[in-house]
């Protein structure tokens, strides 16, 4: 699961 935020990139969960 991948989420993108303004100014930051964060990856959550198994790839």
From Swiss-Prot:
Keywords: Aspartyl protease, Hydrolase, Protease, Secreted
Recorded family membership: Belongs to the peptidase A1 family.
Organism taxonomic ancestry: Eukaryota, Metazoa, Chordata, Craniata, Vertebrata
Tissue expression as described in the entry: Expressed in placenta, specifically the fetal cotyledonary tissue (FCT) (at protein level).
Identification of the protein by name: Pregnancy-associated glycoprotein 56B
GO cellular component term of the entry, any: extracellular region
Compartments it resides in: Secreted, Extracellular space
Single GO MF annotation: aspartic-type endopeptidase activity
A biological process from GO: proteolysis
């Amino acid at each position: 699961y991948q989420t993108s935020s303004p100014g930051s990139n964060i990856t959550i969960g198994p790839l």
